[in-house]
Regions:
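Active-site pocket-lining segments that scaffold enzyme catalytic pockets across diverse folds
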Residues: 1-17
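Thiamine diphosphate
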Residues: 21, 25-194
C-alpha cells in the first residue's frame, strides 16, 4: 500500500510466523502505531488484546489485529464480543491452514524426528475441512471477506478500515497465504472415523 491511509492506534499481533507479512502488508503510520505481540507460545491472546486496546484508545483511533489462523482457533468467540459491544476492530488473518510455527520449530529442534522424515505432523494441518473465517465471523455478527490474491488485499483493507473508522463496526479479512518451511507441502492428518 502506498502511504498511511489512517493513523492506526495499535496493532496487536498473535502470529509468530507472519511478522514479515505484517510489516509488508500493513504498512500504515508506523511512527504513531503501538505494536504488541505474544511471546512464549501464547496462542490465542490476540483477540482479547485487540478488544482491550480498543477500549483503551476509544472510538476515534483505529485498532488493527493481525493473527494467524492457528492463533484464531483459540479465540474466535471474541468476534461475538466485538459485535455485541460495537468494538470496531479490523482483524486481518494470515490463513495458511496450519499451525506453522509448531511445525517449523519441531523441524528445527528435532530435525531427525520421524515427523520430519515422513512429513507427517499430527494435528498441525488445519484443512480438510477448511475453516471459512469470514463466515465464522459473520455467524457471530461481524462482517468480513476472504482474500485469495495480493491484488485483492489493498481494496479489502480499505473496505475494512472504512467499516471500522466510519461505520464504527468490526470487520474481518481472511487472507489466504502460502505455507512455508519444512513440511509446508504436507497435507497429512490422521484420518479415523467413529
Amino acid at each position: 500500500m502506498t502511504g498511511a491511509m489512517v493513523e492506526i492506534a495499535a496493532v496487536p499481533t498473535n502470529s509468530v510466523e507472519s511478522s514479515t507479512a505484517r510489516t509488508t502488508l500493513l504498512p500504515f503510520g508506523h511512527d504513531a502505531m503501538g505494536w504488541t505481540r505474544s511471546g512464549g507460545g501464547s496462542l490465542g491472546f490476540g483477540v482479547g488484546a485487540a478488544i482491550g486496546a480498543k477500549i483503551a484508545v476509544g472510538r476515534e483511533r483505529p485498532v488493527v489485529l493481525h493473527l494467524g489462523d492457528g492463533a484464531l482457533t483459540y479465540s474466535a468467540a471474541g468476534f461475538w464480543t466485538m459485535a455485541r459491544y460495537n468494538t470496531a476492530i479490523l482483524t486481518v488473518i494470515s490463513n495458511n491452514e496450519t499451525y506453522q510455527v509448531v511445525r517449523t520449530n519441531w523441524a528445527r529442534e528435532v530435525p531427525d524426528s520421524k515427523m520430519v522424515h515422513t512429513g507427517k505432523y499430527p494435528g498441525l494441518y488445519l484443512d480438510a475441512p477448511a475453516t471459512d473465517y469470514a463466515a465464522l465471523a459473520r455467524s457471530q455478527g461481524v462482517e468480513g471477506e476472504t482474500v485469495k490474491t495480493l491484488k485483492e488485499l489493498e481494496p479489502a483493507l480499505r473496505r475494512g478500515l472504512e467499516r471500522t473508522t466510519r461505520e464504527n463496526k468490526p470487520y474481518v479479512i481472511d487472507v489466504k497465504v502460502a505455507r512455508e518451511g519444512v513440511g509446508a507441502d504436507s497435507t497429512w492428518y490422521q484420518d479415523w472415523k467413529l
